[in-house]
């Protein structure tokens, strides 16, 4: 298994699909990486040479992925909560942020129903 950005990439899959195992790289970005490194999208990881895997590593290193991306996302959410803006308040209360209704629905965000105390 090739190791890119601290993640073991599956050997049996095509390059584009295998790169999506890295958090922060989807299909579009994986295709862009393959185009930039001149590696065929349909080539399997086990068929690539070490030099090609090194070029993939260098190209992936240009993007914000894995732990750094997770940290940035959590810092952005924390910043919103510290500002006290509407989105920050919604995060703090674990409610939907983007205008969805909450009288009914929103169960995923709100969690399981709580019994009414008498």
Swiss-Prot record:
InterPro entries in the record: Rbsml_uS13_C, Ribosomal_uS13, Ribosomal_uS13-like_H2TH, Ribosomal_uS13_bac-type, Ribosomal_uS13_CS
Gene Ontology CC entries for this record: cytosol; small ribosomal subunit
Short name of any one Pfam family annotated for the protein: Ribosomal_S13
Any GO BP annotation: translation
Keyword Zinc: no
Oligomer status and interactors: Part of the 30S ribosomal subunit. Forms a loose heterodimer with protein S19. Forms two bridges to the 50S subunit in the 70S ribosome.
Entry's family note: Belongs to the universal ribosomal protein uS13 family.
Protein name: Small ribosomal subunit protein uS13
Protein's organism: Shewanella sp. (strain W3-18-1)
Gene it is expressed from: rpsM
């Amino acid at each position: 298994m090739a190791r890119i950005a601290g993640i073991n990439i599956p050997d049996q899959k095509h390059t584009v699909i295998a790169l999506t195992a890295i958090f922060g790289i989807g299909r579009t970005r994986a295709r862009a990486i393959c185009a930039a490194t001149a590696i065929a999208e349909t080539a399997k990881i086990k068929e690539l040479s070490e030099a090609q895997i090194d070029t993939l590593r260098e190209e992936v290193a240009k993007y914000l992925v894995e732990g750094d991306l997770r940290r940035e996302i959590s810092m952005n959410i924390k910043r919103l909560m510290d500002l006290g803006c509407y989105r920050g308040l919604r995060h703090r209360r674990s409610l939907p942020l983007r205008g969805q209704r909450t009288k009914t629905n929103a169960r995923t965000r709100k969690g399981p129903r709580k019994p009414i105390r008498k």
